[in-house]
């Protein structure tokens, strides 16, 4: 079952293509995936049943983040890059290579054009990877026909079959000029970088001619060839047309908050994304300029060869300081990348606002719902009390404080209650009177602020005792309500008003959830304090039974050793070091 945090983020997912990064409890990326529709895909992990590896993956996810792209193909390419960079544990299939083809122009005297699954630092040109394997293979065949290089083993003394077919420049029987290869490689690179308009126009005309001449099989082949080319060389913003290392900064501002995205492009790939959110004091352009300078002032952040920024940034000033060209993209692929980064900036900030809104409903909004149900003005502070004891022995009380719907643990208080013969047994009335008087008489004495509402864990007895002390002994008019549980010991309702009427809250409301959290928290705090006290009392009673151990010696032992086990393990010499006589020290050792 998804956590509340994940449920909130699932509700905010965009129905756009992109990549998602799943994180574990240590904020480590354990899985990277892509999706045509992030909303549907990511939700499926938490809204469907799974088995095997997927079930194990989902059980370890505590958070996720997304990066939106313009197309599904861009998401695919980014996914491969992120997997190769982060090596997530659950991406087993893609850990060794991508599993998808690249088109490669080899770095040889007589270069070849071929398909490969691995990218190596061998001086060759690589294009891809391509999600449509068959389309990539067909495009390779097309290129080998239109822009031939070497297609045989070479140097075999006679022309090969491909030379006769016009698909090899003839390295098989002659020395091919390097300029011939260079010219062909330029054409291939332009083609694979998306400059295919002339080729597509030519194929379209040939297809139309074939159809007019009723050569339908030929027309279908040309149609398929067009589709393969479009699938292979579709414009890709994730892959840039040069290998210049560059960083790209984009921002989005709303409601006084600035969202910044940083894209790191290396080896023609978007290899990393960073995001930052903070309040904006100056103009967003000034804030971004300052942020960029601070970013590269950190010792681990290396300057790239080029920095891309949105319009309105003082580029010359930044460039003079950083000694790096700083540019604003005006058209083409870089501008498209900037727009994609700006879109991510906007979505991140919108997610923050909506999560804050949801959190506000759960805290401040929930507290307001409780106050509304009781007919009280909205306040900030709720204090809740609960008692704990075993058949009246070692009675304690605990108080928890919630401010604007959030637990403030530094304001929690614990009370050891008076235990007398007159108060033997579970005397909830006396326990309530004592703790309420002690708490609020002290606040009055110290001149501190009073809460807006007091909640008593219990029924009519606790409620009336608290009201009586406040009104008749302390002269205070703090509203008091009783938290009532059902037969299953679950939060059920509130008791409030002169007639102690029952106030029901909608069990599905945030106010009811907050009331449950308060009741559970004060109960937990009281129980833990009582157990702690019982443990100390048990330890003290064992020491009291030892001859020669009085209150002072007992206090020394407890203060220095902390537990019965440590006292038992201590040597006679260690006990004597506390000022205990050797005889008493030996008696302690024998008794324990």
Swiss-Prot record:
Primary localization class, coarse: cytoplasm
InterPro entries registered for this protein in UniProt: GIY-YIG_endonuc (IPR000305), GIY-YIG_endonuc_sf (IPR035901), GIY-YIG_UvrC_Cho (IPR047296), RuvA_2-like (IPR010994), UVR_dom (IPR001943), UVR_dom_sf (IPR036876), UvrABC_protein_C (IPR050066), UvrC (IPR004791)
Cellular-component GO terms for this entry: cytoplasm; excinuclease repair complex
Domain UVR intervals: 197-232
Residue ranges occupied by any GIY-YIG domain in the UniProt entry: 15-92
SUPFAM superfamilies: C-terminal UvrC-binding domain of UvrB, GIY-YIG endonuclease, RuvA domain 2-like
PROSITE patterns: GIY_YIG, UVR, UVRC
Family: Belongs to the UvrC family.
Subunit comment: Interacts with UvrB in an incision complex.
NCBIfam families tied to this protein: uvrC
Role this protein plays: The UvrABC repair system catalyzes the recognition and processing of DNA lesions. UvrC both incises the 5' and 3' sides of the lesion. The N-terminal half is responsible for the 3' incision and the C-terminal half is responsible for the 5' incision.
Record-linked HAMAP family: UvrC
The protein, known as: UvrABC system protein C
Organism this protein belongs to: Latilactobacillus sakei subsp. sakei (strain 23K) (Lactobacillus sakei subsp. sakei)
Lineage, uppermost ranks: Bacteria, Bacillati, Bacillota, Bacilli, Lactobacillales
